[in-house]
Amino acid sequence: MTAIVDIIGREILDSRGNPTVEVDVVLEDGAMGRAAVPSGASTGAYEAVELRDGDNSRYHGKGVRKAVDAVNGEIFDAIGGMDAEQQAQIDETLIELDGTANKGRLGANAILGVSLALARAAADSLDIPLYRYVGGVTARTLPVPMMNIVNGGVHADNPIDFQEFMIMPVGVQTFSDALRCGSEIFHTLRSELKKAGHNTNVGDEGGFAPDLPSAGAALDFIMGAIVKAGYRPGDDVALALDPASTEFFKDGKYVYGGEGKTRSIEEQAQYLAKLASDYPIVSIEDGMAEDDFEGWKLVTDMIGKTCQLVGDDLFVTNVTRLADGIRNGRANSILIKVNQIGTLTETLAAVEMAYKAGYTAVMSHRSGETEDSTIADLAVATNCGQIKTGSLSRSDRAAKYNQLLRIEQQLGAQAKYAGRAALKAV
C-alpha cells in the first residue's frame, strides 16, 4: 500500500524569487507528500551541489529544469514501486544512483526534494504527523527559536560585517511564549531604529538591515529593545551571533570591510571572546572560517565551556567533517541544514553523531526559503531543542514558527519547551 506510484517534480520560486525544486511523491494508497527545497546565499565550499541549469536565457542561469528532469525521469525510474517506508534504503539508492561524492550529477536539490517528500508521503499514509513518523513517540521537545532580527553580511545591503544577530527566549515556559516574546522585541526594535533615524527595511531572512557601523552597535540596539519590551537580557532572552566569517576571511586574515579593520586569527578569536563577555551571548555560529582549523581550535579552547560554538560552513551537515571536528576539538555544536547534505537519512545521522559526542544540534533554514515547514517537524522529531528559521516577518519564515505552534497544541500536556537546557553543551 505504501509503494511509490508517481513522483512529480516542478520548478517553483523561493523567497528570493529564484527557481527551486518542489517534489510530490504519490503512493499506491493515495497518500501524497510534498517538499520544496531551500537555497543558501552564504554557502560552504563543502556542501552538496545544488544543480542549476546555467542557461542564461532563463532566470539568469539559475533555472532548475535539469534537476526537475532528473526527478521526473531517472530518479522515478530507479525508485518507482519501492516501499516509501524504507527511507534509509531509498536514500541509499538515490546516493548510489547519483554516483558522486557531492550529489553533483543529479543535484542535491533533486535528491533532497524526493527524500523529504517521501517521508511526508509515508507519514500521510500512516495518518500521523511528520515529527511523529520521523521521531517516534519520544518526539515532544519544542525548540528554542534563534530569531534573526538584525541582518548584515551577504543577507543585507548594509555595512555590518556579521551576517546575523539573533535573540533566543531561553527563560520562558512554552514555545508560544517564546514566539510572543520574539515578536514583541522585533516590533520594539523597529520603533527604536525608526526613532534613531535608521531605515527599517528587512533582509533576506526578515530581520532589519540598518546602516550601523559595527557588531557592537547592532548588539546595543537589540539590548535596548529587549529591555524596552519588558524582558531581562540574559535571563529571559539571550543573544546569538552568526558572523558567517568565511565570507570575510581573506589570505589568513579577517577583513572587516564595513568597520574598516583587519583582524588576525588570534585577534578574531579574542574579539569573539570579548563580545561573549560584554553581552549575554550564548551561541556563536561560524565565528571562524570553514578552513581556519587553527582558529576554530583556538576559540573553542578559549570560550567553548561557556558559549555554544556552532559549525555551519565548518561541518556542512556532513558526518565525515563532523567526526574530524570532534576528534580535533573544533566547535561544540553543529548547524543542521538538510540541503547541505541532500537526504533525510544523512541529516539524521549527523544529528545522532553530534549527540553521541556531546555536541548540540541546531535545525536550520536557508536564506532562500519557501513555505515548506519540514524543518519545524524535524526539530521536534530529533528533540534537538533549537531552531534557526529567521525573523518575525516574511511568511516563508513564519511558516515554520506557525507549524511549531500547531505541534505544541497537538502535543498538549506532553509538549516540553527546551529553554536554557537546549544549550547543554555549555
UniProtKB/Swiss-Prot annotation:
Annotated catalysed reactions: (2R)-2-phosphoglycerate = phosphoenolpyruvate + H2O
GO CC terms: cell surface; extracellular region; phosphopyruvate hydratase complex
Enzyme Commission (EC) number: 4.2.1.11
Pathway this chain belongs to: Carbohydrate degradation; glycolysis; pyruvate from D-glyceraldehyde 3-phosphate: step 4/5
EC top class named in words: lyase
CDD domains (UniProt xref): enolase (cd03313)
InterPro entries linked to this entry: Enolase, Enolase-like_C_sf, Enolase-like_N, Enolase_C, Enolase_CS, Enolase_N
UniProt keyword Glycoprotein present: no
Cofactor note (record): Binds a second Mg(2+) ion via substrate during catalysis.
SMART domains, sorted: Enolase_C, Enolase_N
GO MF: magnesium ion binding; phosphopyruvate hydratase activity
Pfam families: Enolase_C, Enolase_N
Protein known as: Enolase
